[in-house]
Amino acid sequence: NVFFYELGYDMSLDAEGNYDSDRGTDTLAKYAKQFGLGEKSGLEIPESEPQISDEYSILSAIGQGTNNYTVSQLNRYVATVANRGTVYDLTLLKKTTDSDGKIIKEYEPDVAGTMDGVSSNTWDLVHQGMIDMVASTPSFSGLEVTMAGKTGTAQQSDLHPDHALFVGFAPAEDPEIAIAV
């Protein structure tokens, strides 16, 4: 969290070095939208509207603040990380058929956006950090595939318990699946 606290602080500094939380949350929102976190994921079932944090840039940088996403929205985000910048609309459908098994419609992935301007080196560093997190966590020892991931804890209030979160993808070298639980 210290790294992301510092990142949230640095994003909030103007050219003279003055701290402005709104500047930081605006920058975070810009990138969150590029990852597709500013809209529903595309699933064919009812889904909550996402909320990109609009206050407390330092807390928002570690995923707290007023961020609010469904698991499917986070899955879409981590799939974008896995494939290095293409945001897809999610779907539960591969095809529809009639009662005889004849294909009525096949569903292809729809691209909702791309993250331009992110270097291969940056994606490599993000992937390696996520691989290292999984490799250094005893809960993941013994996996037969190299996995990349990130844990998190959503804190709602003193009256509600914390929510554990894991997002990841595998195989890390050539991702085939992204998960959020």
Predicted regions and their residues:
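Beta-lactam-recognizing serine transpeptidase/beta-lactamase-like catalytic domain environment
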Residues: 1-180
